[in-house]
């Protein structure tokens, strides 16, 4: 577990002391976030908006959850994301109805993964989510999924994911891992708890005898329960791009026969020429959640026609 994960989830006595010392900053941050939410006016768009979000920093499975849910409506769907750590700015149409228009460095790893996993959908990245939504509507999409969209004051269905491992302190950053006050879980239209309303299963494609785990995801420790025996583990910052020569050197040092990577990391390494073993994720979402989403989509459709 990396330092920042230990600090938020399994802090040492020293880290607990640091968290308490930072409490005034945490309270200030939470107050600002709460005030901003209270003063925001809801905005309406002529489309069905469905947000997949969380309250904590780091990964809770938003992207695979979104992919699993959006598959049911794929022909009508656009996905709007910020495109974290991408090498471009502004609005970018990553894919349109299955045709991929950009490369991973410009789109970002998550947007490219969504584009590949939803081959009939349209994927848009934009720091300004409203511009992304309007572009999706312009392209004829009437169901729009927002990746990490909980904080935006739009008229939408809010799905919040609650992770299996929760932060030690129920405080906003920097004392805790929450981006907004934890009580906002109660404001979600759908609250999905990992292990109860959604779960994951992992299968490894192209396994080899000596796999070296290489990953650039927010919480690499969450992979532990799915891992086979590996010869080593290398964790980069979330969304980081890889240096091929560094990976080649690491493989040689560990006498590795392949790199074990997530699907999100695979999109950045497909053209590397390195042998890859990939952790293929299968996502299972409770049928009650799917039924709730169908009901919401059906209720919005007459208003949009």
From Swiss-Prot:
Q: Mind telling me which InterPro entries this protein's record contains?
A: LpxK (IPR003758), P-loop_NTPase (IPR027417)
- Catalyzed reaction equations: a lipid A disaccharide + ATP = a lipid IVA + ADP + H(+)
| List of residues binding ATP | 56-63
The protein's GO terms of the molecular function aspect are: ATP binding; tetraacyldisaccharide 4'-kinase activity
Keywords noted in UniProt: ATP-binding, Kinase, Lipid A biosynthesis, Lipid biosynthesis, Lipid metabolism, Nucleotide-binding, Transferase
Q: What Enzyme Commission number(s) apply to this enzyme?
A: 2.7.1.130
Give any single GO term for biological process.
Answer: lipopolysaccharide core region biosynthetic process
| Regions annotated as coiled coil | none
Pathway info: Glycolipid biosynthesis; lipid IV(A) biosynthesis; lipid IV(A) from (3R)-3-hydroxytetradecanoyl-[acyl-carrier-protein] and UDP-N-acetyl-alpha-D-glucosamine: step 6/6
GO CC term (a single one):
plasma membrane
EC main class here is transferase
Task: Tell me which family the UniProt entry assigns to this protein.
Answer: Belongs to the LpxK family.
HAMAP family in the cross-refs: LpxK
Q: What does this protein do?
A: Transfers the gamma-phosphate of ATP to the 4'-position of a tetraacyldisaccharide 1-phosphate intermediate (termed DS-1-P) to form tetraacyldisaccharide 1,4'-bis-phosphate (lipid IVA).
- In Swiss-Prot or TrEMBL terms, this protein is called Tetraacyldisaccharide 4'-kinase
Q: Which organism is it from?
A: Wolinella succinogenes (strain ATCC 29543 / DSM 1740 / CCUG 13145 / JCM 31913 / LMG 7466 / NCTC 11488 / FDC 602W)
Q: Output the lineage of the source organism.
A: Bacteria, Pseudomonadati, Campylobacterota, Epsilonproteobacteria, Campylobacterales
